[in-house]
């Protein structure tokens, strides 16, 4: 598969923003260990958004193919459902030259308060990940990273969310 460069990703993010802003989350699935599929409804259509953190084919895109889902949803999927189901997509954004796409959802928590949950799709080869963040703190990550795995950046529930360190080489657009 072709490596996803920042320019292509920026175009994809813009298209997703145009298509999906204000769409409501209907369902969430985790068909494979590294992929999340979110079904979103606009007034006129239903879309399936694929977020893949698979090392060889990390990407975000709309998908047509229906996938087999495990009978018992994995714990990350259950958590995503708890925090995102019924939420509205308010924005899809990314920093120029970066490889992280931020999906901002307006959701209602258990107390009935409106909260903003951001799903961060970090699309960086074998370090790709999906991280759910609220108020700057990590709710959870698809691939948790503890101190043993990295002394530079940990991804664990409750820790502040920081973006990955920038690569040394410039990313020419």
Can you annotate each of these PLM segments?
Residues 4-68, 72:
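A structured, charge-rich N-terminal accessory region that forms the first stable segment of a protein
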Residues 44-173:
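Phosphate/anion-contacting hairpin/loop surfaces
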């Amino acid at each position: 598969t072709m490596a996803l460069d920042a320019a292509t990703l920026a175009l994809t993010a813009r298209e997703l923003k145009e298509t999906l802003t204000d769409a409501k989350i209907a369902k969430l699935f985790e068909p494979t260990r590294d992929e999340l599929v979110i079904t979103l409804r606009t007034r006129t259509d239903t879309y399936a958004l694929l977020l893949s953190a698979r090392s060889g084919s990390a990407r975000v895109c709309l998908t047509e193919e229906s996938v087999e889902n495990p009978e018992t949803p994995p714990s990350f999927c259950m958590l995503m459902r708890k925090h995102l189901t019924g939420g509205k997509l308010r924005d899809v954004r990314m920093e120029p030259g970066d490889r992280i796409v931020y999906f901002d959802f307006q959701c209602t928590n258990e107390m009935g308060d409106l909260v903003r949950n951001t799903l961060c799709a970090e699309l960086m080869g074998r370090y790709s990940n999906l991280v759910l963040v609220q108020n700057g703190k990590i709710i959870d990550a698809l691939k948790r990273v503890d101190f043993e795995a990295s002394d530079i950046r940990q991804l664990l529930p409750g820790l502040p969310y920081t973006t990955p360190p920038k690569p040394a080489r410039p990313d020419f657009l």
